[in-house]
Amino acid sequence: MAEEHDNRNLPWVEKYRPNKLEELISHADILSTIDRFIKEDRLPHLLFYGPPGTGKTSTILAVAKQLYSPKEFNSMVLELNASDDRGIGIVRGPVLSFASTRTIFKSGFKIVILDEADAMTNDAQNALRRVIEKFTENTRFCLICNYLSKIIPAIQSRCTRFRFGPLDNQQMVPRLEHVIQQERVDVTEDGMNALVTLANGDMRKSLNILQSTSMAYDVVNEVNVYTCVGHPLKEDISNIVNWMLNEDFTTAYNNILDLKTLKGLALQDILTEVHKFIHKVELPTKVRIKLLDKMAEIEYNLTAGTNEKIQLGSLIAAFQVTRDMIVMEAS
């Protein structure tokens, strides 16, 4: 009964995390290769890389659960998030002491899982390289990261690398439908499309959005999903572009500022959606290039932490210049 209660309070990303390799919904080629390694008892050191929410951690945890019973799991598997402690201490401390000891009741190797390994310093990675070399006989390492370029070549060459790409819609929808059925959530068709669109290939993100929207609203539809995550709706973007192109600067600025405040929108999200909108509209090539170049500059400024109101003014100005260029070309 207690376990059932615990399960009910779990975040859905953990509650529905796959426990076996066959339960994973994507990357069949990677899974079949790893399954063959396990069956032939030839599991190498592994390096999983790719964007978040694509099944990297779930895959190695499913491998560990396949290799060890629940009783053995804690003594045979060390799971660390490298971004908690990025320095050399994590390698010389918990990793070294775990890798260097043998267990008495289980033959074979232990597994060390280092999540977010790309956050480790170069010194820590060099120390890890030596530990990997020294304890290969009784320990296998699995490094998980988003950016392969941040892992030193010496570690890359000692691991078998697998890239986990973003999931496509056909893979995400059945898994979402399974969770929706289990949790008895009322989801509309446009709500499902919104979940998949906003997740952008990230299964974890789609489940988190689904759970938070279902807790905030009785029905998970497009408007409620976008409102819950504070993302602009299509009609909002249509209005914003319309104001920027057809109203004077002050009116457009005040209208967009009011909408941002009312719905709690971030300029970064507005910029992303406006960018998609621009590619669907007929514009002269020269005009489109100039506008996209200016939008890229604004996005760069936003990532540097500049004032949103100033960048909003810059965005509106870019569109007003675009309008004048279109008028000049037409005449």
Regions found by a protein language model. Give the residues of each.
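Helix-rich C-terminal "collar"/helical-bundle subdomain used as an assembly and partner-interaction module
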Residues: 239-331
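Short hinge/gating elements
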Residues: 14-21, 77-78, 157, 161, ...
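C-terminal helical "lid" of AAA+/P-loop NTPase domains
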Residues: 112, 192-198, 204-218, 224-226, ...
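P-loop/Walker A NTP-binding region and its immediately flanking N-terminal helices
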Residues: 1-161, 171, 295, 299, ...
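Conserved beta/loop motifs at nucleotide-recognition and modification sites
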Residues: 232
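Conserved AAA+ ATPase core "coupling" helix
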Residues: 152-197, 206-209
